[in-house]
Structure formats: structure tokens, C-alpha cells
């Protein structure tokens, strides 16, 4: 094969194998989880302390402030999954999860309300798409509400199974 250079402004019509096209989509992602339980102040938003990187080829996730800084302008898909535990049956009332942009704006929010049938734990997921500019940052937040205590965001399954019960991540989709 020959190498053909395409000048700016030209149109490409390809009948052969295309390589080297694409961009940064394959390397613009991250995933992190929490390695130990985190107790939250009741009915107060707090940042989820996802301190363990599972994947981050661009080194854009900071495990000290739990923040993902966007490397390039685009549309990103994010998710949070986790489990809150009140420690006692019938105590957990509700949980909000949110993704904050640049420290203040709630871009995505999800709520589970157990007020009519109070529970002990609530597994939640939040996912969605956010349009971001290079250098914007996003963080995972939660606000659990308990009848008589401070709920815990669980690092492992509330049913005793080993392995992570929480994760936060995302990737660029466009």
C-alpha cells in the first residue's frame, strides 16, 4: 500500500481499507470505585469518594478530589451506580444521586423515594449524556435521607458478597 496525503478541504471517497481515522474516542474514558464504606451526613449532599481508578488511559480522573476533567470538547455518557445502607431495617427514606458540572450545576439527577415503605438499603443507578467543553470537570454526588442516622455508601455488597457494589465512570460518545 501507498500512503496518500489528503489536503485540507478535500473530500475522501474510499473503496479500500481505511486506517488511522477516528480521533480520541477510544481513549477518552474512565471508571473508578470506592474501596471502603463512606458515611454521609443525613439529608446532605456529599461527593462520592471514588478513590480507586479502574480505567483511565488519559489520566484525567483525580483520585484525590474524585473529579474527572474532560480532555476534549464533546458529548459524554456518564454513569453512577451504588448502594446506600441505613444499618437498620425501616430507616432509609430516600436517596438522590447527581452529577455536578464545574462544582455547581447539577447536570443529571436521579431519586429513589422509600417514604411509604421505608427500607434498609437502596441500590441506585444514574446515567445520561452531558455536552462538555475541554477542561470542564464532573463529580458524582449523593444525598441520602435516613430516619435516625447517617447512611453509608457501601464499598461492597450489603448482602456480604465480595466485590465492588459501586462505580462511577464515563466516556466520550461524540
Q: Language-model segments: which ranges?
A:
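Extracellular jelly-roll beta-sandwich "head" domains, especially the C-terminal globular C1q domain
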Residues: 22-174
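Extracellular beta-strand solenoids
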Residues: 1, 5-6, 12-14, 20
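Surface loops and adjacent helix of pleckstrin homology
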Residues: 9, 15-17, 81, 143
Amino acid at each position: 500500500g501507498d500512503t496518500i496525503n489528503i489536503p485540507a478541504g478535500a473530500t475522501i471517497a474510499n473503496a479500500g481499507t481505511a486506517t488511522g481515522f477516528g480521533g480520541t474516542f477510544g481513549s477518552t474514558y474512565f471508571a473508578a470505585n470506592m474501596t471502603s464504606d463512606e458515611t454521609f451526613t443525613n439529608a446532605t449532599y456529599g461527593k462520592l469518594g471514588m478513590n480507586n481508578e479502574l480505567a483511565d488511559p488519559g489520566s484525567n480522573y483525580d483520585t484525590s478530589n474524585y473529579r474527572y476533567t474532560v480532555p476534549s470538547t464533546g458529548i459524554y455518557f456518564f454513569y453512577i451506580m451504588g448502594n446506600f445502607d441505613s444499618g437498620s431495617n425501616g430507616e432509609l427514606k430516600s436517596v438522590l444521586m447527581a452529577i455536578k458540572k464545574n462544582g455547581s450545576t447539577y447536570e443529571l439527577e436521579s431519586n429513589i423515594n422509600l417514604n411509604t415503605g421505608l427500607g434498609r438499603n437502596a441500590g441506585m443507578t444514574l446515567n445520561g449524556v452531558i455536552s462538555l467543553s475541554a477542561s470542564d470537570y464532573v463529580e458524582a454526588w449523593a444525598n441520602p435521607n435516613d430516619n435516625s442516622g447517617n447512611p453509608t455508601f457501601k464499598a461492597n455488597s450489603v448482602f456480604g458478597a465480595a466485590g465492588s457494589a459501586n462505580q462511577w465512570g464515563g466516556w466520550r460518545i461524540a
